[in-house]
Amino acid sequence: MIFDLKVNGQRKADGISTVSPVFSWECGTERQFTVQMSSNPKFQSAVMYLDTRNCYCIYDGVPLQAGKTYYWRVRSRVGEWTESQFTTI
């Protein structure tokens, strides 16, 4: 089970100013995850899509736009998505 999603250590991540946010989550015993981030809440066009064995990842893609809400989600290899969002400044 994946829970407690955070961006830069914050659960309610409004006002993220960094261009390389750190996404983290509590992951129980799972050790393989897929992470997606999008500017669309339906994830129709992913800004980030990666697989990791860690309970965190660092965004290193194109610069994020100021004043925009981004949506992100994570799941274990066979699990359901757990979703969150954050806003940049």
Please place each PLM-identified region on the residue numbering.
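Pro/Thr/Ser/Gly-rich low-complexity, intrinsically disordered linker/stalk tracts
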Residues: 1-28, 84-89
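A generic structural motif
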Residues: 26, 75-77
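Recognizes extended acidic, P/S/T-rich segments that occur
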Residues: 32-69, 77-85
